[in-house]
Curated annotation (Swiss-Prot):
A cellular component annotation (GO) from this entry: nucleus
Localization terms from the record: Nucleus; Cytoplasm
This protein's encoding gene: PCO5
Alphabetic keyword roster: Cytoplasm, Iron, Metal-binding, Nucleus, Oxidoreductase
Family matches, as InterPro entries: PCO/ADO, RmlC-like_jellyroll, RmlC_Cupin_sf
Stated name of the protein: Plant cysteine oxidase 5
Residues that coordinate or bind Fe cation: H98, H100, H164
Family matches, as Pfam families: PCO_ADO
Cofactor note: Binds 1 Fe(2+) cation per subunit.
Organism ancestry: Eukaryota, Viridiplantae, Streptophyta, Embryophyta, Tracheophyta
Organism, as annotated: Arabidopsis thaliana (Mouse-ear cress)
Oxidoreductase among keywords: yes
Amino acid sequence: MPYFIQRLFNTCKSSLSPNGPVSEEALDKVRNVLEKIKPSDVGLEQEAQLVRNWPGPGNERNGNHHSLPAIKYLQLHECDSFSIGIFCMPPGSIIPLHNHPGMTVLSKLVYGSMHVKSYDWAEPDQSELDDPLQARPAKLVKDIDMTSPSPATTLYPTTGGNIHCFKAITHCAIFDILSPPYSSTHGRHCNYFRKSPMLDLPGEIEVMNGEVISNVTWLEEYQPPDNFVIWRVPYRGPVIRK
């Protein structure tokens, strides 16, 4: 039945704008609907069965393998206010560390297990640097394994772990709502990051408000490897009436 996904779409439409969520209360409405999602709500019943049949981590491919497991992306909707999509990830697949500039992101694990690592910039107001490739200090927000069903997560433009990466432990799917969505026109590019290899960077810094942040991680922008590919595939779940 299309009831769930239609209700979620309608809630997004009334709660999200080209500038992001219209209010925290509106964002809560979207989150409350998203919490109830099941694989059958988006046509992923068969994919979810793969988790039960998965033989275990012995067959997992290392993230440095020459041919990384293929990740699939199903786009349900995109407009100026928000985008809705699902990443289906096989065991061992990785979505590298990436950001969501000026965006609020709701994510929900639909099935399976994954490892999530996320950061926020130590000084978020320094987003416009003379050299965008120079290393910037970031603070760790999350470094955990997640298994469905687990609560939906919320990333804000400067808090909540806006820069994150995923590694699939089992077959898994992550449902994403971005508001506003990525847009080259509006300067919201998806940039990828890695830990800086420089050894002389400080592990502790004092930011502009006087706060001292220890265990700093320095991140630098980079191009992900050529074998990192996300395949766009058609969404075949219940139809959304727009």
